[in-house]
């Protein structure tokens, strides 16, 4: 029997708008270290490569260097507050429902930690939609390394020949290219429009995935 078609999605800036909680946690860390915080658009430009890079970029932007324990402190604080203002984008469950009814399954490939990913999905009631979660600490590698995407797809029982990657960052487009899969750039997310370069398609809203996904596999 042929495997289900699989839509693999990034999390932050693709399924959920987590920027308010990420910004708040980062600014609490900056304040604790005697440094100025950041407006949300500046934080948006720093996300996409995982927690370590986010914290390192924040300190570098303030001409500083993250100290031992800063990253762990951020992760602990953010995870504890990860769902205070985070919300799913409009149309997420309706769109997933439409695709599921036509023979699709879903997985998440994110550089976010397992703990924070579970916290967000559980709080928003989204966890049951996904056959597999490939997080930033699930495998030895992370996006844009294609092994992250392929490992996630394998965990979902999917076939790369019948899968599409969706995300709002250049890493999402690059990981799909490396895995030999089509990709959709999530233009509603945090990534600059230039990050769509190389994507198979661009979606302006989540609901568009219901038609774009199937088109890319025909």
Question: Where do the protein language model's features map onto the residues?
Answer:
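Asp-based, Mg2+/Mn2+-dependent phosphohydrolase catalytic module
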Residues: 1-5, 41, 100, 113-114, ...
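N-terminal helical cap/lid subdomain that shapes the substrate entry/recognition surface
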Residues: 2-94, 113
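Conserved SAM-binding loop
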Residues: 8, 15, 88, 106-109, ...
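Small/polar loops that bind or transfer phosphate-bearing groups
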Residues: 18, 46-47, 108-109, 167-168, ...
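Substrate-recognition element of Asp-dependent hydrolases with the DxDx(T/V) motif
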Residues: 26, 92-122
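Short helix-capping segments at alpha-helix termini
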Residues: 31-36, 62-65, 101-102, 125-129, ...
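Residue-level detector of anion-binding/catalytic polar loops
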Residues: 36, 105, 182
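Well-ordered alpha-helical segments embedded in enzymatic catalytic cores
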Residues: 91, 95, 148-151
């Amino acid at each position: 029997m042929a495997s289900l078609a699989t839509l693999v999605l990034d999390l932050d800036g693709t399924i959920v708008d987590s920027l308010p909680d990420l910004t708040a946690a980062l600014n609490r860390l900056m304040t604790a270290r005697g440094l100025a915080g950041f407006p949300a658009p500046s934080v948006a430009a720093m996300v996409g490569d995982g927690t370590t890079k986010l914290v390192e970029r924040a300190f570098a932007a303030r001409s500083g260097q993250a100290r031992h324990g800063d990253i762990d402190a951020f992760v602990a604080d953010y995870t504890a507050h990860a769902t205070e203002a985070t919300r799913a984008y409009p149309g997420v469950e309706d769109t997933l429902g439409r695709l599921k009814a036509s023979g699709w399954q879903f997985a998440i490939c994110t550089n976010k930690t397992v703990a924070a990913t579970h916290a967000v999905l559980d709080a928003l009631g989204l966890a049951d939609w996904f056959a597999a979660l490939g997080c930033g600490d699930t495998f030895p590698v992370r996006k844009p390394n294609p092994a992250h995407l392929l490992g996630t797809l394998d965990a979902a029982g999917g076939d790369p020949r019948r899968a599409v990657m969706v995300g709002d960052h250049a890493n999402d487009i690059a990981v799909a290219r490396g895995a030999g899969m089509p990709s959709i750039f999530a233009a509603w997310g945090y990534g600059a429009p230039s990050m769509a370069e190389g994507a198979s398609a661009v979606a302006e809203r989540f609901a568009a995935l219901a038609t774009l996904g199937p088109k890319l596999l025909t």
